[in-house]
Structure formats: C-alpha cells, structure tokens
Amino acid sequence: MPSTNQPKALATSRSVIRRSKAEDIAPIRSWLEAEDAAGVHGNFLCNWSVIARAHKDQELLVYIDGKTGLPVAFQLGRLLQSGILQVKQDFRGRGIGKKMVAYCVNLARRKSEDLLVIQCKPSSSIPFWQRMGFTLIPDSDPPNKAYKVLERRHDLPAVGKPVDVVIRFYPEERKWRDACTALVQLAASGKELPDGVIQLDRRISFHEDAYPLARDVVVEAEVNGVRQFIDKAKYRELQQRGVTRCRNGWFIDQIRPEESR
C-alpha cells in the first residue's frame, strides 16, 4: 500500500496587490538595476526618483508574488495620469500587468473617476494598452498618450416620466460661433422626477485629454428635443444644473432644474 505519510506541499500565500511598504523598495531597486545592466527593454530605473517619491507619497502599488513574498511588479499614476507600470522580466506573460490595470480601474470606479489617461512608455507597450481598452490620442503631447472612458450605468427609479436626453460637448468657440460642430454627442434615457430632476440611465462624460483643442468646453443639454442649457462647463450655473468636474474632464449623471431667481 502506498504510504499515507507523504510530506504535504508547502502552502503558499496568495499573490496580492497593495500599497508599497518600506521593505518592498530595496527588492524593486535590485531587480531594476539587474535588468538595466542586462539591457532588458522597458526598464524604468531612470525614473527611480519618481518611483521613490510615489512610495513616499503612498501612491506606489506593488504586486507581491505569493511564493516568494517579494514585489515583482509596480504601478504608479493609478491610470489617472501619466505613470509607470513595470513587471519583472521573468514574471512577464503571466497576466500580472492585466491584473494591475484591473485593480487600478476598480480604484478609479470607487472614487467616481471614470476618465482614465496614461502614456504608453515604451512605445512597444501600445498593443498591451490597446488590449486594455485604451485609445491613442493623435499628436498628443507628451507622445503616445491614451485614454479610456469607463461606463457607469444608473438604475432609473420607478416613479417619474420617461424622457430622452441628448448631451453635446463643443469646443470653446461655440460661445461665439453657432455653426460649430460638436466634439461629442451622446444620448441617454432618463426619468423626470416629481422635483424636476432628470435622472439619466448612464453617466455622460467628456474626456479633456482626448480633445486638447477644446479649451473651455461648452456643454449643451436637450430633453425631448428642448434645449435645457448651453454654456461653458466651468460656469457655476451649469454645475448647479448637474455638470460635474472630475480629474480628467466632466460628467453628467442628472440634470437639475434651473434655480428660481
């Protein structure tokens, strides 16, 4: 009979993504230096001061390998600004980069930040970011910037009158030129509630990085074909109507009635 006293495999912890700790920094520096000396493509040792500052500011995320307990990837920028994502060479091709991106997406969603932006560095990373759903911004400065708009759906209340909503975003020149084509036109369904608020079934967003020439973007809202407002998003009057600022642009979840004067 086979022995029942075979040694059990050692249990290993699960790999985790978390904020960096002091003990993570030396191992990261060590493998960055080793890969830089070996000429590994896509090494960010040259940005060490940026990485160290992100750690100090508690903005550095690390992927801790469950078997070794060591950091084998890191990310800074949280996909809300140009940042860095690097995976240790011998851990590439295992989906770690994809997991780091998904983690950052969830962080952004929890903060109600649906407009993501990155810089694809090195340029060989462009296919990866495109697979992650990012779109390159033509002629961007710095080059190879890319953006992504996360979808956010809302459950409409049972009460209220169904309405059709169209939101348009224009460049600043719409303020003085009527014959100006909208940069973005998006439609949504909604419910007009007893208090006059119109709740949309999805978030309507405008990503500033995707349209750098828009300058002070102008927003127009129509409900059942009737214009509700058209003006610069930054104006207080529009923000009272539901135009909301986020890190990388603007969004509308609901249209509020005009305040009585």
Q: Where do the language-model regions lie?
A:
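Short amphipathic alpha-helix that is part of the acyltransferase structural core
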Residues: P2-C46, I64, P162-V197
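Active-site rim helix/loop that mediates acceptor-substrate recognition in acyltransferases
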Residues: L32-G66, V197-V218, E222-F229, K234
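Short hydrophobic/aromatic beta-strand element in the GNAT-like acyltransferase core
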Residues: Q58-V62, F74, I84
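Glycine-rich phosphate/pyrophosphate-binding loop shared by adenosine-nucleotide-utilizing enzymes
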Residues: T68-F74
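Conserved acetyl-CoA binding element of GNAT-fold acetyltransferases
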Residues: R78-D90
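Conserved hydrophobic beta-strand within the GNAT/NAT acetyltransferase core sheet
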Residues: S82-L85, L116-C120
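Conserved acetyl-CoA-binding loop-helix of GNAT-fold acetyltransferases
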Residues: G93-N106
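Conserved beta-strand-loop-alpha-helix junction that forms the acyl-donor binding cleft
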Residues: V117-Q130, D141-Y147
